[in-house]
C-alpha cells in the first residue's frame, strides 16, 4: 500500500528539458531569469527560466571559433562573454540578440573567466560616477554605419541606439579576469581593455575570482603529471589596483573608449572596402574579358585614345562597346560606380574623420592624465608613449585626407569618361545625341585623357591582383591590406609645401608636424596606428601585472578526476567572493573512505587579515522526510557544489547505498550552520597549509550535517552538476549525460510529489512509487480519489517527470 507524506518536500520543478547536444558550461544571468549554455558543437544558447524556453542561439563559425571553453556574465547582465580555444578569441555578445559587440584575441586558450563588479565607494569615485562624460558634450555623436554592407559585426549600425554606451555599460568599474594554460592570467577593464597581465603562476587555471574590493585575486590551478593532476590554491595581493582605484577607473574608461573607437574605424574601413570591391567587380567583369580576347597588339589605352582623338573605334572595341557593354549597360555601370565612389567618400568624411577626431580627443585627455605623475606614473601611464600614439592618429588623418583628394579627382575623371563614352556609343548606333551632351570642353578632354592614362595603363605590379591587366582604379590601392607601396602614389612634383618640408631637416623632425607616408596605403597607416596605440597602452598592463604578487599558496589535492574535460568546464572546484564580509570561499572535495567529502576553504580578501574556521570539512549524515516518518542514513559523496548566494551553498550528493534513479539528492546547505559561533573553536584547522590537504584529511575539522528540510530526492535523473542563482531563487541541475536539465524554484515547496519514505515498499514490490500524471488510467484516478475521500488529511502529490529523459 502506498504511503503519502504529511509535509511537502522542498523545491519545485519549473522546467525540464532534454537537449540535443551535450552541455559543457552553464551560467545564470546575475540580473534576469536567463541562463547561458555552451555545448560541444561550439554553440552558445540563451534560455529563459519559464519552461526552459530558448531565447536565441549563437552558432559556431570560422571567424569567431567553434570550441567554447567558458562563459561569464557582465555584472549588469547586459553582456555575455565567452572564450573560444581554437581561435583564442573572447567574444562579448549582446543579451538582446546573438550578435558580437566586441571581440579580441588572447595569447593562450582561456580555460576559465570571472567578471567582477567593483563595490568600493569613495567621494572621488562617486563624483566621477555622477559626472557627465565631457566627451558627450564636446564631441559630435558618431554617425551610424550603413546597414547595406556585409560587415561581420552589426555594432554601430543600429538607429537611435548608442552602441558604444551599450558596450561600455555603467561607469562603475567592472573587470573581466581570464585564466588559461601555463599560468596565463589577464584582467580586462569593462571586459574590453587589458589593464593587467599576471606572471609567476604555474599550471593551468581552473578557477579564479577577483575580490570586489580589489584587494586580492584567488586562483586555483592544476599541474598535470603522470595521469594525475595536483590542484593548488593561490591568493595574489592586488594592492596597486585598490590604492589607485579612482585613477584606475578613469584610465580604464579612457582605454575602453579608445578600444571602441578603433573598432568603429575598422568597421568603417570594412564598409569602404566592400564599396570599392563593388566598383572593381563591375569594371573587371566587363573590361578584363575584352583585354584577354582582343586579337590586336594595341593596348586598351591606345584603343580608347584613338577613339578620343579621331572619333572612330576599332572593330574589336566597337564589338566590346555594342555587345558587352551596350548603351543601357554603360549608363547603369556609370551610375553604379558613381554611387560606390560617393559611399566611400561619405564614409571617409563622416565616419573615418569623426572617429579619428574622437580618438585624438581621448588620447589627448589620456596624455593630460599621464602628466599628473603623482597619480598616474605608478600605474605605468607614459606621456611619451601617448604622444607617439597621437602622432600616429595624425598620420592616419593625413592619409584619409589624401584619399579624399584622390576620390574627388577620380570621380571627376570617371564622370567625364563615362559621359564621353556614352556619347560615342550613341553616335555608333546613330541615335540622337542631346546638344548639352555634345558639348565637350578642353577640361573635359583632359579629364578623359587623365582617366585613360591612370586607369588603363598596364601595370605589371597588378598582374596577380584583381584587374591584373590594367590599373583599374586608383582608390582601391589605398584600401588594400598589404605592406606593398602604392602602385600609383600621389604626384608630389611641384608641391611647394612638400618640397619645403623635404629640404628642411628641422621641420621634417618637428613633433608639431605629423609624419606623412606618401607611398603607403590607408590600411598600412591604420595598422601602424593600432600597433603604436596598443604599445602605448600595454605598459600599464605590464606595470599593474608585476605588482600583483603571490601571497599565499595552498596545495589542495591530487586527483585523476581533474583530467576529465567536462568536469573542468563545469567549474568545480568553485570560487566565490562574499562582497559583504570581504571573504574568498573555495569549495572542493577530498576522497575519504571511498566518499568525496566537501571542504570549504575561506580566506579574507585582505591578505593581512586572518579569518576563523579557515578550513572545514562537511559530511552529510541523515535526511529526514515526512515529518520524521523516516530517516535516510547512508554514505553520501559530493558530486558538485556551487554558491547559491552569500549564505547558502547548493550541493548535489550521491547516495552510495541508493538504488539507480533514486540515489541523487539536491541540498541547500546554510553556512550559518557550518560556521556556528558557539563551537567555532572546536573546528579550527591545526594542520599545515604548506602540506597538501588531502594528506591531512584526518585532521581537517569536519561537521556532519543532518537535514529535515531544504533537500530533495532527484528521481529519474543521474544528476551530476548544478548552477544556482540566489537572486532569482532558482537552480539548474544537469545530468551526467550532459543533456538532461531540470530547473527548480528553490524557495517554494513542491505540491506535486510522492513521499520518498516508501523506499522499502518500492524495493519489495519491485516497482517505483513515482506516479506519472500523464499515464494514470481513469480507474487509478478514481481509486486515488476514493482514498483521499476516506482520509482528508492525506494529500496525493503527482509530478510530471519523464524517466526516459535521462536514458
UniProtKB/Swiss-Prot annotation:
The modification Phosphoserine is found at residues 757-758, 777, 779. Keywords: Cell cycle, Cell division, Isopeptide bond, Mitosis, Nucleus, Phosphoprotein, Ubl conjugation, Ubl conjugation pathway. Residues 755-788 are annotated as: Disordered. It is found in: Nucleus. GO terms for cellular component: anaphase-promoting complex; nucleus. Residues 770-785 have a biased composition (Basic and acidic residues). The modification Phosphotyrosine is found at residue 469. InterPro entries: APC4, Apc4-like_WD40_dom, APC4_C, APC4_long_dom, APC4_metazoa, WD40/YVTN_repeat-like_dom_sf, WD40_repeat_dom_sf. This is Anaphase-promoting complex subunit 4. The mammalian APC/C is composed at least of 14 distinct subunits ANAPC1, ANAPC2, CDC27/APC3, ANAPC4, ANAPC5, CDC16/APC6, ANAPC7, CDC23/APC8, ANAPC10, ANAPC11, CDC26/APC12, ANAPC13, ANAPC15 and ANAPC16 that assemble into a complex of at least 19 chains with a combined molecular mass of around 1.2 MDa; APC/C interacts with FZR1 and FBXO5. In the context of the APC/C complex, directly interacts with UBE2S. Interacts with FBXO43. Belongs to the APC4 family. It comes from the Eukaryota. The keyword Cell cycle applies. There is a cross-link at residues 772, 797 (Glycyl lysine isopeptide (Lys-Gly) (interchain with G-Cter in SUMO2)). PANTHER family: ANAPHASE PROMOTING COMPLEX SUBUNIT 4 APC4 (PTHR13260), ANAPHASE-PROMOTING COMPLEX SUBUNIT 4 (PTHR13260:SF0). It comes from Mus musculus. GO terms for molecular function: protein phosphatase binding. GO terms for biological process: anaphase-promoting complex-dependent catabolic process; cell division; protein branched polyubiquitination; protein K11-linked ubiquitination; protein K48-linked ubiquitination; regulation of mitotic metaphase/anaphase transition. The keyword Iron-sulfur does not apply. Pathway: Protein modification; protein ubiquitination. Component of the anaphase promoting complex/cyclosome (APC/C), a cell cycle-regulated E3 ubiquitin ligase that controls progression through mitosis and the G1 phase of the cell cycle. The APC/C complex acts by mediating ubiquitination and subsequent degradation of target proteins: it mainly mediates the formation of 'Lys-11'-linked polyubiquitin chains and, to a lower extent, the formation of 'Lys-48'- and 'Lys-63'-linked polyubiquitin chains. The APC/C complex catalyzes assembly of branched 'Lys-11'-/'Lys-48'-linked branched ubiquitin chains on target proteins.
Amino acid at each position: 500500500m502506498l504511503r503519502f507524506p504529511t509535509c511537502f518536500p522542498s523545491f519545485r520543478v519549473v522546467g525540464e528539458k532534454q537537449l540535443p547536444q551535450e552541455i559543457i558550461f552553464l551560467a545564470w544571468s546575475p540580473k534576469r531569469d536567463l541562463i547561458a549554455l555552451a555545448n560541444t558543437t561550439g554553440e552558445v544558447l540563451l534560455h529563459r527560466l519559464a519552461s526552459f524556453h530558448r531565447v536565441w542561439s549563437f552558432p559556431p563559425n570560422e571567424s569567431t571559433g567553434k570550441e567554447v571553453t567558458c562563459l561569464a556574465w557582465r555584472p549588469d547582465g547586459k553582456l555575455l562573454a565567452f572564450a573560444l580555444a581554437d581561435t583564442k578569441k573572447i567574444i562579448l555578445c549582446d543579451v538582446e540578440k546573438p550578435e558580437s559587440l566586441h571581440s579580441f584575441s588572447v595569447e593562450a586558450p582561456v580555460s576559465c573567466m570571472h567578471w567582477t563588479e567593483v563595490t568600493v565607494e569613495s567621494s572621488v569615485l562617486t563624483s566621477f560616477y555622477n559626472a557627465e562624460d565631457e566627451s558627450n558634450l564636446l564631441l559630435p555623436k558618431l554617425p551610424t554605419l550603413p546597414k547595406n554592407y556585409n560587415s561581420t559585426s552589426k555594432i554601430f549600425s543600429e538607429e537611435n541606439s548608442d552602441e558604444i554606451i551599450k558596450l561600455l555599460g555603467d561607469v562603475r568599474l567592472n573587470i573581466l579576469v581570464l585564466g588559461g594554460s601555463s599560468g596565463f592570467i589577464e584582467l580586462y577593464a569593462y571586459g574590453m581593455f587589458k589593464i593587467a597581465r599576471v606572471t609567476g603562476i604555474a599550471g593551468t587555471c581552473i578557477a579564479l575570482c577577483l575580490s570586489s574590493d580589489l584587494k586580492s585575486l584567488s586562483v586555483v590551478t592544476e599541474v598535470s603529471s603522470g595521469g594525475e593532476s595536483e590542484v593548488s590554491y593561490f591568493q595574489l595581493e592586488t594592492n596597486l589596483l585598490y590604492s589607485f582605484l579612482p585613477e584606475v577607473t578613469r584610465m580604464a574608461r579612457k582605454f575602453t573608449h579608445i578600444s571602441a573607437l578603433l573598432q568603429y574605424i575598422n568597421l568603417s574601413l570594412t564598409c569602404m572596402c566592400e564599396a570599392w570591391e563593388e566598383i572593381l567587380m563591375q569594371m573587371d567583369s566587363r573590361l578584363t574579358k575584352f583585354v584577354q580576347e582582343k586579337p590586336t597588339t594595341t593596348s586598351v589605352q591606345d584603343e580608347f585614345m584613338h577613339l578620343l582623338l579621331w572619333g572612330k573605334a576599332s572593330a574589336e572595341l566597337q564589338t566590346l562597346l555594342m555587345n558587352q557593354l551596350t548603351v543601357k549597360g554603360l549608363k547603369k555601370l556609370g551610375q553604379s560606380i558613381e554611387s560606390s565612389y560617393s559611399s566611400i567618400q561619405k564614409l571617409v568624411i563622416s565616419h573615418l574623420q569623426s572617429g579619428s577626431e574622437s580618438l585624438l580627443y581621448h588620447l589627448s585627455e589620456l596624455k593630460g592624465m599621464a602628466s599628473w605623475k603623482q597619480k598616474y606614473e605608478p600605474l605605468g601611464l607614459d606621456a611619451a608613449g601617448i604622444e607617439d600614439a597621437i602622432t600616429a592618429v595624425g598620420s592616419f588623418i593625413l592619409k584619409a585626407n589624401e584619399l579624399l583628394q584622390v576620390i574627388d579627382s577620380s570621380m571627376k575623371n570617371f564622370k567625364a569618361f563615362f559621359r564621353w563614352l556614352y556619347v560615342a556609343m550613341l553616335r555608333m548606333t546613330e541615335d540622337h545625341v542631346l546638344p548639352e551632351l555634345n558639348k565637350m570642353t578642353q577640361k573635359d578632354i583632359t579629364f578623359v585623357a587623365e582617366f585613360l592614362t591612370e586607369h588603363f595603363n598596364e601595370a605589371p605590379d597588378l598582374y596577380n591582383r584583381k584587374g591584373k591587366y590594367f590599373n583599374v582604379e586608383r582608390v582601391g590601392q589605398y584600401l588594400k591590406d598589404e605592406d606593398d607601396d602604392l602602385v600609383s602614389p600621389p604626384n608630389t612634383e611641384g608641391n611647394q609645401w612638400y618640397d619645403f618640408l623635404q629640404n628642411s631637416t628641422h621641420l621634417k623632425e618637428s613633433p608639431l608636424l605629423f609624419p606623412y607616408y606618401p607611398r603607403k596605403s590607408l590600411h598600412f597607416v591604420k595598422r601602424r596606428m593600432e600597433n603604436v596605440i596598443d604599445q602605448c597602452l600595454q605598459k600599464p598592463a605590464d606595470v599593474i601585472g608585476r605588482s600583483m604578487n603571490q601571497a599565499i599558496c595552498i596545495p589542495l589535492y591530487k586527483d585523476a578526476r581533474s583530467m576529465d574535460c567536462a568536469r573542468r568546464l563545469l567549474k568545480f572546484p568553485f570560487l566565490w567572493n562574499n562582497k559583504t564580509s570581504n571573504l574568498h570561499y573555495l569549495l572542493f572535495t577530498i576522497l575519504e573512505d571511498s566518499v568525496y567529502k566537501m571542504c570549504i576553504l575561506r580566506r579574507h580578501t585582505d591578505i593581512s587579515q586572518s579569518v576563523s574556521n579557515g578550513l572545514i570539512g562537511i559530511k552529510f549524515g541523515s535526511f529526514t522526510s515526512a515529518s520524521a516518518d523516516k530517516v535516510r542514513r547512508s554514505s553520501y559523496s559530493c558530486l558538485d557544489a556551487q554558491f547559491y548566494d552569500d549564505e547558502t551553498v547548493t550541493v548535489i550528493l550521491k547516495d552510495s547505498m541508493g538504488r539507480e534513479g533514486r540515489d541523487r539528492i539536491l541540498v541547500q546547505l546554510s553556512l550559518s550552520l557550518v560556521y556556528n559561533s558557539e563551537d567555532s573553536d572546536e573546528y579550527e584547522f591545526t594542520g599545515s597549509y604548506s602540506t597538501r590537504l588531502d594528506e591531512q584529511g584526518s585532521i581537517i575539522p569536519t561537521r556532519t550535517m543532518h537535514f529535515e528540510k531544504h533537500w530533495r530526492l532527484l528521481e529519474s535523473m543521474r544528476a551530476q552538476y548544478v548552477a544556482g542563482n540566489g537572486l532569482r531563487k532558482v537552480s539548474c541541475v544537469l545530468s551526467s549525460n550532459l543533456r538532461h536539465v531540470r530547473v527548480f524554484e528553490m524557495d517554494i515547496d513542491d505540491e506535486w510529489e510522492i513521499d520518498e519514505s516508501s523506499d522499502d515498499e518500492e524495493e519489495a514490490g519491485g516497482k517505483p512509487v513515482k506516479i506519472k500524471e500523464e499515464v494514470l488510467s481513469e480507474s487509478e484516478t478514481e481509486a486515488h480519489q476514493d482514498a483521499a475521500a476516506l482520509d482528508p488529511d492525506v494529500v496525493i502529490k503527482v509530478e510530471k517527470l519523464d524517466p526516459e529523459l535521462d536514458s
